[in-house]
């Protein structure tokens, strides 16, 4: 049946609203991915490899909760607000509260087993339950806001900008607030960090509510109960394994997260430990954010002309080569290091600006391939990959920090500092290059095929509404 309800057209309000959604996401996600390891190694005195193991265990839990939430979204009935938006308002409070609970420095005097158990429980609740229950609907909502490829690219860009603004707060402002000077060294203050975590949680709730208020779901394609029953979880997973576009973008995104989060996590060690200057970490974020801003300006016109996957190959290869240069040159001047990292962030920024539009391309491709639209399920699998990338990074970083002998008592020894620099440059270099190769040789949705798929689905959906 044709829907006669007048829906306001896609506009700037949707872009801003969607931007606030990722701002809210990253107020807890980036705080965790960038500082949780540092908080537990330096404040709670838990070995890095243990923190990494807990994060990796949580990702196995996500294998079930992410997919389950995706199916819940696909089976949700359409409401006046849409199918995905209600979850954002419903779950913004719980995710913010549990995020705050993860950073309780007052518990640092507990026995180590108790601290490990506390981290495990709160991290599972935050990431595998509450963050999943808000992030899956939020990501799935992009394809429901508009079916126009240019609109979706705009949403992808504004989503990344929201993450950038959150990143500016997390990576630039937080380091200025959480360190004290002790014996000439920059040492993290647990009490200050707990307060900062509370402020980040409050900001997350505000941003989520703005996202809910400003966006509109327009594409109301919904699978019937019979289709969902026929295409059950087993069939969905079987189709996913055969979906070259989905699997390749999942693997590519894992390497993207490894490169990005390694740089972010290791910044907490490179600047205060290797360069002996935690203040530069905050200033460096401003410069690196400049690289992302330039990427935001040029990504959309370049993607429209050459294709999203095509420009991502070039940008990630540039970032990989620069990271290798850093590893071999090993600049002793911190500002030379920051200048070269600027180029890495520019390369990463181009891919970050288009990656969410790539996911909507994959959702379209899956609908054509399988005959059913499953925004929630496809996005859930991708979200699981992102969390897996986060866990692999934390596990890898934690293991490598333990391998080089990093502890609270050895944090400023010469050999340990050299190991910190190795991790911060070589791991991203390898990941950037592998990401570029995957997009070029494995990922099938280049510009020509994407344009054909969009036109096919537009005709299909218009015919269905008649």
Where are these regions (language model features)?
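Membrane-embedded alpha-helical bundles of multi-pass transporters/translocases
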Residues: 2-466
């Amino acid at each position: 049946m044709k829907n006669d309800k007048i829906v306001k057209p896609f506009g700037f309000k949707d872009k801003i609203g969607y931007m606030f959604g990722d701002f809210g996401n990253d107020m807890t996600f980036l705080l965790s991915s960038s500082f949780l390891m540092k908080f537990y190694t330096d404040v709670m005195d838990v070995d890095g490899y243990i923190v990494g193991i807990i994060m990796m265990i949580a990702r196995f839990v996500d294998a079930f909760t992410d997919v389950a939430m995706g199916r819940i979204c696909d089976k949700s009935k359409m409401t006046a607000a849409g199918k995905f938006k209600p979850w954002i308002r419903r779950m913004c409070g719980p995710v913010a509260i549990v995020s705050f609970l993860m950073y309780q420095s007052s518990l640092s005097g507990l026995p180590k087993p108790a601290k490990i158990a506390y981290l495990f429980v709160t991290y599972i609740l935050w990431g595998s339950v509450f963050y999943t229950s808000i992030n899956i609907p939020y990501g799935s909502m992009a394809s429901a806001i508009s079916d126009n490829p240019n609109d979706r690219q705009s949403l992808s860009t504004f989503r990344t900008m929201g993450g950038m603004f959150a990143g500016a707060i997390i990576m630039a402002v937080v380091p200025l607030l959480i360190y004290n000077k002790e014996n000439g060294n920059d040492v993290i203050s647990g009490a200050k960090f707990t307060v900062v975590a509370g402020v980040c949680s409050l900001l997350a709730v505000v941003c989520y509510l703005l996202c809910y208020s400003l966006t509109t779901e327009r594409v109301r394609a919904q699978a019937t109960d019979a289709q969902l029953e026929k295409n059950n979880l087993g069939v969905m997973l079987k189709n996913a394994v055969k979906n070259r576009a989905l699997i390749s973008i999942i693997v590519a995104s894992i390497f993207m997260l490894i490169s990005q989060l390694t740089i972010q996590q290791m910044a907490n060690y490179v600047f205060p430990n290797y360069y002996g200057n935690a203040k530069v970490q905050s200033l460096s974020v401003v410069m690196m954010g400049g690289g992302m801003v330039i990427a935001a300006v040029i990504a959309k016109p370049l993607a429209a002309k050459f294709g999203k996957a095509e420009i991502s190959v070039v940008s990630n290869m540039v970032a990989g080569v620069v990271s290798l240069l850093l590893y071999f040159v090993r600049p002793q001047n911190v500002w030379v290091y920051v200048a070269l990292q600027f180029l890495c962030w520019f390369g990463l920024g181009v891919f970050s600006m288009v990656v969410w539009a790539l996911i909507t391309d994959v959702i379209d491709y899956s609908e054509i391939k399988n005959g059913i639209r499953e925004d929630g399920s496809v996005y859930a699998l991708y979200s699981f990959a992102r969390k897996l990338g986060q866990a692999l990074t934390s596990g890898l970083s934690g293991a490598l920090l333990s391998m080089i002998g990093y502890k609270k008592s050895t944090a400023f020894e010469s050999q340990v500092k050299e190991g910190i620099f190795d991790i911060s440059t070589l791991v991203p270099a390898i990941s950037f290059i592998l990401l570029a190769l995957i997009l070029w040789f494995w990922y099938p949705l280049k510009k020509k095929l994407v344009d054909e798929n969009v036109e096919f689905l537009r005709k299909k959906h218009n015919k269905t509404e008649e």
